[in-house]
Amino acid sequence: MIEMKPNGESNFYTFNRFYERFKNSDNRYDTWELIERYMQQLKEWYHSFDLFHHIGFLVATGTSVKSLLDIAMSTDHPIKKSDFKLRVLDMIREKMAFKVGDNDFGEDIDYAELNYEDHSEFIQYVLLLFNIETIRQKGDENVRFPFYRYKNEGTWSLEHIHAQNSESLKTNQEWKEWLEVHKKSLEGLEVSSDDKKQIEEVIDKMNTIITHINEKGYKGSIRDEFNAVAPAVINILSDGDDKSQMHTLSNMALLTVGENAALNNSTFDVKRMKIIAMDKAGEYIPVCTRNVFMKYYSSSDTKLHFWSEEDRKGYISAMNNVLYDYKEKNSNKEIKLIRNRINYGNRK
């Protein structure tokens, strides 16, 4: 860890590096003292609830532990513990000031202009910090952000909260899975009698396609049949959705749905049912992702089965409350971890 362990190296890499240094050292006492100082500093960070989360974010997004140790333990430029904490906050703000092009002279990107196709890494930074700070700001010393899950489990990906794209599905199995999960969602909707008739007609078409997929030797085009019904399904399960916001922060979450293409390309209600199933099974769900699908950030009068414009605005408002408007409970001091407020829609 301290010596920038390369990928694929043994878990004992750090020990082995120090052991080699120990063997070749003329003054083993100094080497051992250095090890103890490193260990003491790391333990101090770990036991500091705030530094655990703030340093954890920096390391999770590419800052080396060694560089942080160099700052905290420098003898040439000694730094007070209080000043080190402020320096860490500055490093987070610097990391959250996104630019395109040259690192020093590139163009600033407004948070509202971040989109999944061009800035997925930046969006992941925002959502990761949002999840970390949501936990840290609650102040429960017994509940910490699980960095070991984020690093080791490899299942956290950037996902659309509500997807409208079924074009990436290519196989009969993917089409069948998509039809089955969305049919279940349609069957659970509470609608008027007129809408119910329309939904039943769409479900009949979905059942026909599923039958054709299961039918050996079927000569028709499953692709054409699927492409004909999918837009109607998506339209029913969308609520006045603004397609211009499809790839923006307001429609993205850290989600652990894995490699299931049919689910990844599903609408909000289908993913919501999956999140509920995962929760019942005791699987870990990032806190802000769980809040999104449980409508924690939404007003009480929003429709449970849809991800609407009001829901997206509530989601962005929650990000601002945590990342821009947060005040320390004891001092009421503002801590802004992003350079300005996140707007919904275009830059204002």
Map each language-model feature to its residues.
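Flexible coil/loop and intrinsically disordered segments
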Residues: M1-K348
